[in-house]
């Protein structure tokens, strides 16, 4: 017996959906991408459209109401109009638009919409949009970082919907709960206790971040430092030279017209120091990098290093760093200054007594630093960065306790039930504030490690983040951001993004949502539900390996709040569905078999869960060059996905091409990035 068709099985306003999905990638304020980094997120517009059109009947399902093709087309156009409004970012929480969309879902499901499960929840777009449309959302993932992202998106905010801020500043300005919708009160408290953390951290370690003296010709006085620009160094391979050779890939600081600046290496015998020069950088000083990887020219003698030589010295822990320039907050923009003794001494601090650590995988595809002796995640941070991050992390528990005490003072029930146990009283609220503060620190690590570059863009000179690509590359000249400045890469900037997400993007709803750590290959017990998911793409992204960078810091801050979730030292990897040969002694065949078997078991579980009258939707991202150029066959990942779906008992009833990435973003420029998705 054939089932009545849903809209997604017949027609979609694809151009409108793709236009909104593509536009969304450039939206920053309030978007989930600003809550916490996750790789290859699906656009909210696409997820919203797919869920809604999978639930709403196509007019052809009701010939008694729409007996002619003309009548069906007219009704279809009416539904398209609802969907075209629904996918717009500006309408994400528009009550009229959402009410119209939800009414159609109820009409097509006899007022009994199904729960939705995403077994590979990842960045949380699909569960969030299910919640927005009034569904009971279930988000499962094996990765604790992904689990926390989903908790922060769909589980925690509804629990404290409409909560008035509890902090003392807000209490003096408020009269009742009027005006605080959704998670806006929670956002206000995250901002307040984040400011307290910043002040307290500066009281403890602010002396490590002195202001820089500004010469008279640049305005005089002192300036807050935005960033320190460093170069890694090794001893020159020429025995007659032996200088500490800077491994700088660029000496350009600013390309802004009329404000160009660069770093000039000054050699005196076998010593090198640096002076900042204003004006356009001469071509011969743009870079001393002369080949791929670690091939550099010595400024003293002209000797060229080999990649093997630098790796050898790195593994022997004989690689150093030298300060090349200081970036300050000027009265009219950035000012660039030569390093001085005070700034160099301030950075020379011992490592803190304890800090998060964990071994990086020996997988050069995604991790370059281990080849140069940086084998632990802690090796990716300077001692000053470790000191700042551990200080911030230690303050999360203190801020959490203050928020709990203030919540009790405002009358929030003091039931002592933990957030992880489903609590919604004062203790749970304090812990909820702590979760978002911990997210701010996690985001800060992406801008406060020695893999961050100085982006000398013509329009904006800023500290770049470590994950410009879906990998951790080796960086030779790096920017150390001042976490207490007013520039980018600060804790307060990260918390500002988080608070905007809570205020803008979180739906104002009370839909039940459940997030748990779960292996997609196991039976979770759900039945007669809707399933929509964005599974891993064979070997494209090593989620578990990459997320360890964040996990070690998140665990430091939240292991007492979610002890079960953070019981392991690193992210679980044995069951992760990624075809990674290095986990199988380099065997591509074993990696392929592992992925194929795992994906088949997953699809078999999904088949058990799915409600017969609602199509299962699966995203498969691809690049147009995603073919084997030698055999001219489709990629192994695509074949594996189709095989698993069909062998599990499904029939593919339709496919839709959806734009899900910006083609010009950094990771797609010359790399095997995922440009579009096919929705099955």
Where are the regions a protein language model picked out?
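Nucleic-acid modification enzymes, centered on SAM-dependent nucleic-acid methyltransferases
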Residues: 2-117, 127, 131-528, 536, ...
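Short, glycine-rich nucleotide/cofactor-binding loops
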Residues: 590-596
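Short beta-strand segments at enzyme active-site cores
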Residues: 614-620
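Conserved SAM/SAH-binding loop
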Residues: 123
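Conserved glycine-centered beta->alpha loop in an early N-terminal alpha/beta scaffold
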Residues: 120
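A short glycine-rich, Lys/Arg-flanked "PGG" loop and its adjoining helix->strand segment in the class I
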Residues: 596-614, 643, 647
């Amino acid at each position: 017996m054939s089932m009545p068709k849903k809209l997604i099985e017949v027609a979609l306003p694809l151009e409108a959906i793709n236009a909104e999905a593509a536009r969304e990638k450039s939206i920053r304020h309030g978007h989930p991408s600003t809550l916490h980094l996750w790789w290859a997120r699906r656009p909210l517009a696409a997820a919203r459209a797919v869920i809604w059109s999978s639930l709403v009947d196509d007019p052809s399902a009701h010939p008694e109401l729409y007996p002619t093709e003309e009548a069906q087309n007219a009704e279809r156009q009416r539904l398209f109009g609802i969907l075209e409004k629904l996918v717009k970012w500006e309408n994400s929480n528009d009550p009229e638009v959402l009410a119209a969309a939800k009414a159609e879902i109820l009409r097509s499901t006899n007022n009994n919409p199904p729960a939705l499960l995403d077994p590979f929840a990842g960045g949380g777009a699909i569960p969030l949009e299910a919640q927005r449309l009034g569904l009971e959302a279930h988000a499962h993932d094996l990765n604790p970082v992904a689990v926390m992202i989903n908790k922060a998106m769909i589980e925690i905010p509804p629990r404290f919907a409409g909560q008035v801020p509890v902090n003392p500043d807000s209490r003096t300005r408020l009269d009742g709960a009027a005006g605080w919708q959704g998670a806006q009160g929670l956002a206000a408290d995250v901002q307040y206790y984040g400011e307290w953390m910043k002040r307290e951290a500066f009281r403890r370690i602010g002396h490590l971040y002195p202001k820089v003296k500004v010469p008279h010709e640049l305005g005089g006085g002192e300036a807050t430092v935005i960033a320190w620009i460093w170069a890694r160094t090794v001893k020159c391979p020429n025995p007659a030279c032996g200088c500490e050779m800077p491994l700088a890939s660029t000496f350009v600081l600013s390309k802004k017209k009329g404000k160009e600046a660069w770093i000039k290496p000054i050699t005196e015998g076998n010593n090198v120091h640096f002076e900042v020069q204003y004006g356009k950088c001469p071509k011969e000083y743009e870079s001393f990098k002369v080949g791929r990887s670690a091939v550099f020219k010595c400024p003293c003698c002209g000797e060229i290093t080999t990649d093997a030589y630098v790796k050898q010295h790195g593994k022997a822990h004989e690689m150093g760093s030298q300060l090349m320039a200081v970036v300050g907050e000027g009265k009219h923009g950035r000012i660039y200054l030569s390093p001085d003794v005070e700034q160099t001494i301030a950075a020379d601090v011992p490592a803190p007594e304890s800090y998060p650590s964990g071994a990086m995988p020996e997988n050069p595809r995604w991790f370059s630093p281990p080849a140069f002796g940086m084998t632990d995640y802690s090796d990716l941070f300077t001692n000053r960065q470790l000191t700042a991050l551990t200080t911030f992390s230690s303050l999360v528990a203190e801020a959490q306790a203050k928020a709990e005490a203030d919540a009790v003072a405002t009358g929030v029930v003091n039931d002592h039930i933990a957030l992880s146990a489903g609590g919604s009283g004062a203790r749970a609220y304090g812990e909820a504030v702590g979760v978002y503060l911990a997210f701010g620190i996690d985001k800060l690590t992406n801008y406060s490690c020695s893999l961050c570059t100085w982006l000398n863009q013509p329009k904006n000179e800023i500290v770049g983040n470590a994950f410009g690509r879906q990998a951790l590359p080796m960086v030779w000249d790096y920017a150390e951001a001042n976490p207490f400045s007013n520039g980018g890469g600060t804790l307060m900037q990260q918390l500002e993004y988080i608070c905007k997400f809570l205020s803008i993007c979180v739906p104002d709803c009370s839909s039940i949502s459940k997030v748990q750590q779960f292996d997609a290959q196991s039976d979770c017990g759900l039945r007669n539900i809707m399933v929509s998911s964005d599974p891993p793409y064979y070997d494209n992204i090593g989620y578990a390996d990459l997320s360890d960078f964040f996990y070690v810091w998140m665990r430091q801050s939240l292991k007492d709040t979610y002890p079960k979730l953070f019981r392991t030292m690193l992210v679980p990897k044995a069951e992760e569905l990624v075809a990674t040969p290095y986990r199988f002694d380099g065997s591509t065949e074993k990696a392929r078999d592992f992925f194929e078997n795992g994906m088949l078991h997953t699809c078999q579980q999904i088949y058990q869960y799915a409600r017969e009258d609602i199509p299962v939707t699966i995203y498969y991202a691809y690049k147009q060059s995603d073919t084997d150029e030698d055999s001219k066959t489709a990629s192994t990942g695509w074949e594996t996905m189709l095989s698993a779906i069909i062998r599990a008992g499904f029939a593919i009833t339709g496919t839709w091409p959806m734009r899900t990435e910006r083609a010009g973003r950094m990771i797609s420029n010359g790399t095997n990035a995922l440009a579009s998705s096919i929705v099955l």
